[in-house]
Amino acid sequence: TDTYNNFQTKNAPEIARLFEYLNYTVKDYHNGSTGCGLGSSGTGDDVKGLINFMRGSDYFDYDGDCNINEVRASVMGDVYHSQLVEVGRPDANLKYNEENEEAFFRAKNNYQNFYTNNFSRKSVIYAGSNSGVLHAISAEDGTELWGFIPPFVAGLLPQIINRNYNGKVDGNKGGSNPIFAVDGSPVVHDVFMKGIKPTGTIESSASWHTILIIPYGRGGPGFSVLDVTDPESPLHMFSIYNDNINNRVLVADHEGNITQKPYNSGFSSSLQSLQGVKALENYLEAREEDI
């Protein structure tokens, strides 16, 4: 749908702002005096060209034929450090011996019903690539269902542009810089929580969801979280990027809003967080009951 298919040239201004968050700018790769003499001076056409490149076009003229609107021979980037993970029907354990086990929590909160409702769920393979895309691939026939470019990985994409490659590789072929992007291995877990509805609103009560965590690995100190309960209608929950160059943490929420959290000086501990305080209270309460 158009709601999902949003990495397009019509959204170039919004996508270009993602570059600015990480202090990258697009270089003027194509203009009247370079390579094939295509494009115009300035970077407006190159921002759109980079977007089209991510969608499979040969904007950097890999084959040297000066046709930058054709689909290039190899579209998918390398899957290097990212391990593949397959997600099909829910399969978490429901057998428990003690009430402090995770299996007891699942049984108590009707995980069996979640299992039944998703028994026939499409089996999907998820893998991160260094072209900047998390790929969702049908385990049945190998076709790609969709691709997701995390917002803070999108901010890194101008790095692939190298004007020195314009017409100077192998005689007259173009090229681009290889980078690390979505280089970490996805992690999947079924979580009982108040999820996000397709409308963008938060559920009024908790339910089971299949959550996919996407670390960027060598692509940068960040990660994205998707709800893939319905693998054909994924939902972006949030993304976090630790920008240690500018001493801040960037957070993108489920509505696409990006906020900046500056580093605070001083000492902090997880025990001081709301979750840490609650965990300590639960521990002390359980200890008193044992005594």
Tell where the protein language model's regions lie, with residue ranges:
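A fold-level detector for beta-propeller and closely related beta-sheet-rich head/sensor domains
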Residues: 1-291
